[in-house]
Amino acid sequence: MALVKVKPTSPGRRGVVQVVNASLHKGKPFAALVEAKSGNAGRNNNGRITVRHQGGGHKQAYRVIDFKRNKDGIPAKVERLEYDPNRTANIALLCYADGERRYIIANKGMVVGQPIMSGSEAPIKSGNALPIRNIPVGTTICCVEMLPGKGAQLARSAGTSVQLLAREGTYAQIRLRSGEVRRVHVECRATIGEVGNEEHNLRKIGKAGAMRWRGVRPTVRGTAMNPVDHPHGGGEGRTGEGRVPVNPWGQPTKGYRTRSNKRTNSMIVQRRHKR
C-alpha cells in the first residue's frame, strides 16, 4: 500500500493523492455474495430528506459481509483482498475448509493465503475472531459486537481499533478511538488486530466531481439561503448568523448533545467529552 501523488495534468488532477494497493483483486467480486443496491438519496419512506448531501453517484453493488464470524472451528484461508465501494476498509474473501466462501473486513497486514479461524479456540492472531472472554486484557481489537450474536458494530472503518481495558464478571471495558470507555458483554465477539487501509484518511480527492462520483452532494451554507430554508438565511448582502449557530431544524450545532438512547447510558463508563 502506498500514497501516490498524481501528475498535475489538469486543475482537477493537481493535488490528488491516491491510496494504491497492488494486492487488491482487479476482477469482479464473488457473485454469490453480491446483492443489488438501490440508492435512496438520503430520503426516508415518506420521501423526506433525513440525511443531507446524499444522491447521485456511480451505481454500486452491495457485498454481503460476515460481521457475525460464527463459523467456529473450521479453518479458512484468505483467497483474495478486494476493494469495497460501500465502506472505507477493504474486504477479504475467505475460503473455508468445507468450501464455503465469506467476505470479512480486511485487517491491517492481512495477506493472501493467511490462515483465519473463528471461535473460542482460535489462536490470538490478527484476523481471528473470538469472544471477548477469551481475549487477553490489553489486546488491540476491532469489529466488536455490542450485543452477543448481533454482529460487529464498533471499529469497522479503515484504520480503526479498540483496546480491551478490563474484564469484570460478565462485562468487559473497552476504549474506543474517540476516547469513550464502554462496557460490552464478554460473550460479544471481536477480531484481533486493527482494520486495514489505515492510510485512507491521507488521500486527497482533488475535485468536487470526484465526490459526486461517490454520491456526495454539495454543502450549502445556511447564511446563503433564504429564511424559509434555514434559520441563518435572509438579510441584505452578506450577513452573519445573528444567533447561536443551528442546523436547518433549529438544533444547536456547537457542542449540543443529541444522544437520546437513555436505555444504554449505563454501558458508557466515560464519555468522549471529558467535561
From Swiss-Prot:
Keyword tRNA-binding: no
Disulfide bonds: none
Superkingdom, natural source: Bacteria
CC terms in the record's Gene Ontology section: large ribosomal subunit
GO molecular function, one term: transferase activity
Disordered: annotated segments: 221-275
UniProt-listed Pfam families: Ribosomal_L2, Ribosomal_L2_C
Signal peptide segment: none
Biased composition (Basic and acidic residues): 229-241
Keywords linked to the UniProt accession: Ribonucleoprotein, Ribosomal protein, RNA-binding, rRNA-binding
GO biological process: cytoplasmic translation
InterPro entries: NA-bd_OB-fold, Rib_uL2_dom2, Ribosomal_uL2, Ribosomal_uL2_bac/org-type, Ribosomal_uL2_C, Ribosomal_uL2_CS, Ribosomal_uL2_dom3, Ribosomal_uL2_RNA-bd_dom
Family: Belongs to the universal ribosomal protein uL2 family.
Function (record text): One of the primary rRNA binding proteins. Required for association of the 30S and 50S subunits to form the 70S ribosome, for tRNA binding and peptide bond formation. It has been suggested to have peptidyltransferase activity; this is somewhat controversial. Makes several contacts with the 16S rRNA in the 70S ribosome.
NCBIfam families tied to this protein: rplB_bact
PANTHER family the record matches: LARGE RIBOSOMAL SUBUNIT PROTEIN UL2M, RIBOSOMAL PROTEIN L2
Subunit relationships: Part of the 50S ribosomal subunit. Forms a bridge to the 30S subunit in the 70S ribosome.
Protein name: Large ribosomal subunit protein uL2
Organism this protein belongs to: Dechloromonas aromatica (strain RCB)
